[in-house]
Design a protein with these regions (language model features):
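Short, surface-exposed amphipathic charged segments that create phosphate/polyanion-binding patches used
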Residues: 57-61, 99-114
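Acidic beta-strand-to-loop metal/phosphate-binding motif
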Residues: 26-28, 62-75
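Extended, charge-rich low-complexity interaction segments
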Residues: 112-130
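Short, acidic/turn-prone active-site loops that include or flank metal/cofactor-
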Residues: 44-50, 68-71, 94-96
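A generic structural motif
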Residues: 89-99
Length: 130
């Protein structure tokens, strides 16, 4: 538990971005979210909770770009599957052993722009290919 007395399953770093921007970037950690600027949020790890997913679903943001670390591909796909019926979703796979902070904002955004939005069937195919 953190200083609020809550576990990480109730935390979303930069939560307000969900209500301020049409597009948000979901990262694992706060440093990665900060690298992407005001639209970056963090789930405080690769695992995510039902509470965190519901907060994202209930928010007015329309586009969700998932940028978890390379060792979390399965978690990224699982999160996308939770969100794809409610939001437009991109899953951006980062180069091995690199996270958003390692790449920097400019290189990360190039990857984002070169990644297409995914439908449910695309995510299922991707999940089955891992």
């Amino acid at each position: 538990k953190d200083i609020t007395g809550l576990g990480k399953e109730f935390l979303i770093f930069n939560y307000d971005a969900l209500f301020m921007y049409r597009s948000i970037f979901i990262c694992e950690g706060a440093i990665n979210a900060l690298t992407l600027g005001e639209r970056g949020i963090a789930l405080m790890g690769k695992a995510f909770s039902r509470y965190q997913v519901n907060q994202i679903i209930k928010s007015p943001c329309e586009h969700v770009i998932i940028l978890l670390d390379p060792d979390a591909k399965e978690y990224a796909i699982k999160l996308a599957l939770e969100l794809v019926h409610f939001k437009k979703v991109k899953v951006v796979f980062l180069p091995e052993e690199k996270d958003v902070n390692d790449l920097g904002k400019s290189e990360t955004l190039k990857l984002v722009y070169n990644t297409r939005y995914m439908q449910y069937k695309d995510l299922i195919e991707l999940k089955n290919s891992l």
